[in-house]
Swiss-Prot record:
In this alga, in contrast to plants, the small subunit is encoded in the chloroplast. The basic functional RuBisCO is composed of a large chain homodimer in a 'head-to-tail' conformation. In form I RuBisCO this homodimer is arranged in a barrel-like tetramer with the small subunits forming a tetrameric 'cap' on each end of the 'barrel'. This is Ribulose bisphosphate carboxylase small subunit. Pfam families: RuBisCO_small (PF00101). The keyword ATP-binding does not apply. Coiled coil: none annotated. It is found in: Plastid, Chloroplast. It comes from the Eukaryota. RuBisCO catalyzes two reactions: the carboxylation of D-ribulose 1,5-bisphosphate, the primary event in carbon dioxide fixation, as well as the oxidative fragmentation of the pentose substrate in the photorespiration process. Both reactions occur simultaneously and in competition at the same active site. Although the small subunit is not catalytic it is essential for maximal activity. One of its GO terms (molecular function) is ribulose-bisphosphate carboxylase activity. Belongs to the RuBisCO small chain family. Heterohexadecamer of 8 large and 8 small subunits. GO terms for biological process: reductive pentose-phosphate cycle. Keywords: Calvin cycle, Carbon dioxide fixation, Chloroplast, Photorespiration, Photosynthesis, Plastid. The gene is rbcS.
Amino acid sequence: MRLTQGAFSFLPDLTDEQINKQLAYIVSKGLSANVEYTDDPHPRNSYWELWGLPLFDVKDASAVMYEISSCRKAKPNYYVKVNAFDNTRGIESCVMSFIVNRPANEPGFLLQRQDFEGRTMKYSLHSYATEKPEGARY
């Protein structure tokens, strides 16, 4: 099951050329970029591991692409994403995020249903990948 988080997630994987164009857009808007990775694909896992330091005041998209390449090389079977942060007063938020690397095999999620009082159903998601210990999931 393909993980769909962030921009472009329903499209085919971005090529390096397409990623470079998105990075050029991020840099042209004066946004700060950072690269993050994880092997826990749960949709509510919003705390991915930060790769290096955030790239503030970067004037060239190739610096961000270098960090992406380094992360991909070190973590080939992890999800890797780029975030763009706008520090403009009043916004101060992540304004763009997209996945740039994913594992070759994405096992998907188990939907667990639980019956509660009053015929209420509660649902939870469990990633098949997390059945293995961290670092050995893919």
